[in-house]
């Protein structure tokens, strides 16, 4: 019968040292292994990055659309300012005049805004500092369509406030809460022009 010599059996300290060295070697290989790191890091930052990028683009489009609407209102209001629009539509049904003026605004608007969604409000005021039009948004964040959308035919030498409003969709309001001003999450974009009409012949 043969017996294994105890000299061939590693001692406990030697075994622990061997295992520790193997563990350190494996840990070193793990640290040096860079495969898949980029994909993991990109996956961690991709969602917030693209959300922020989209929010920036959406804010820029909103500002651009607002400027486009302002330009359209300014260009169309010149015809009211000179009295040409009133004279050209003297025989037009009063219920259709607002639509006619909206068509004038749409001549200066690119495809950013759907023209048939634009609401028009034209009011005459007794004085500039003494009066101002009612806000088009109610206290609970609704578009006040009941009081917005009237057309008061401006005469000569009258103070006129022309407003156009359209709802613009907002998709990333969580990143920019101030982007939305309506309860449904959309933003009411407005274009305004205030002036005194010329003393045109009536």
Label each residue range with its predicted role.
Residues 2-106:
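Alpha-helical assembly-interface signal, strongest on the long, hydrophobic N-terminal helix that forms
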Residues 2-14, 75-202:
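Short, conserved structural patches
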């Amino acid at each position: 019968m043969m017996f294994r010599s105890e000299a061939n059996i590693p001692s406990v300290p030697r075994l622990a040292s061997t295992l520790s060295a193997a563990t350190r070697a494996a840990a070193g290989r793990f640290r040096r292994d860079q495969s898949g790191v980029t994909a993991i890091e990109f996956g961690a930052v991709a969602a917030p990055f693209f959300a922020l990028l989209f929010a920036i683009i959406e804010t820029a489009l909103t500002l651009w659309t607002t400027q486009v609407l302002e330009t359209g209102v300014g260009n169309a209001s010149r015809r009211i300012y000179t009295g040409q629009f009133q004279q050209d539509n003297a025989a037009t049904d009063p219920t259709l005049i607002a639509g006619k003026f909206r068509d004038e605004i749409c001549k200066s608007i690119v495809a950013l805004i759907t023209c048939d969604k634009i609401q028009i409000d034209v009011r005459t005021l007794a004085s500039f500092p003494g009066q101002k039009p009612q806000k088009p948004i109610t206290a609970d964040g609704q578009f006040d369509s009941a009081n917005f959308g009237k057309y008061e035919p401006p005469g000569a030498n009258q103070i006129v406030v022309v407003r156009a409003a359209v709802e613009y969709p907002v998709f990333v309001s969580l990143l920019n809460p101030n982007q939305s001003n309506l309860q449904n999450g959309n933003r009411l974009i407005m274009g305004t022009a205030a002036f005194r009409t010329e003393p045109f012949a009536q």
